[in-house]
A protein has these predicted regions:
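Domain-level signature for soluble enzymes in the chorismate/prephenate branch of the shikimate pathway
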Residues: 1-192
Length: 192
């Protein structure tokens, strides 16, 4: 940290952290798997960065979204998360300096690119600095514990599209409602 400060180097250097983790994984003879070792060192580096400066990372919120999960997977737990209600707000937060970085979905394996993110990247001076491949698992939840009582399905539009075949096969009669995030859908389901 002192050396970085003396030379005016940025606190977060993802390429350098990746080099260190890669070298540690190559030298690893066990008993930990490489992914476990990487996760441990990512948290050590995150905590070390926080001693220099606690970084704020904007993401598509609220808390509990895949974007939040991706943010902590990439930056570690020692950052301050800033949930934003829309992709536009994530970009605005970083552009205005309210956040040091932003995490937004760019693509997924079923629906392809997230067009709003690409539109914002074209309009913004911000650039992509890294990526996280995040396995996504969707769950259909009901407070009653049985699917017989489900009257509507709320989810983010992207998730509804990803699950459309399964939903059509199992619940063709139910109304589907797109909401701002899957976390918001869970909140709505818990209120029903």
């Amino acid at each position: 940290g002192e050396v970085k400060k003396r030379f005016g180097a940025p606190v977060f250097r993802p390429e350098r952290e990746l080099q260190v983790i890669s070298r540690l994984q190559q030298a690893n003879d066990g008993p930990l798997y490489g992914d476990n070792l990487a996760a441990i060192w990512r948290e050590i580096m995150s905590a070390s960065r926080a001693l220099e400066k606690v970084m704020t990372v904007a993401y598509l919120g609220p808390a509990g979204t895949y974007s939040e999960q991706a943010a902590f997977a990439y930056f570690g737990q020692s950052v301050k998360g800033l949930p934003c209600p829309s992709l536009d707000e994530v970009f605005r937060a970083v552009e205005a300096g309210s956040a040091d970085f932003g995490v937004v979905p760019v693509e997924n394996s079923t629906e392809g690119v997230v067009s709003r993110t690409l539109d914002l990247l074209l309009q913004s001076p911000l650039t992509i600095g890294g990526e996280v491949a995040l396995p996504i698992h969707h769950n259909l939840m009901s407070q009653s514990g049985t699917l017989d009582d489900v009257t509507r399905i709320c989810s983010h539009a992207q998730s509804l599209a990803q699950c459309q075949h399964w939903l059509t096969a199992h619940f063709p009669q139910l109304k589907r409602q797109a909401v701002s995030s899957n976390a918001e859908a869970a909140r709505l389901a818990s209120a029903d």
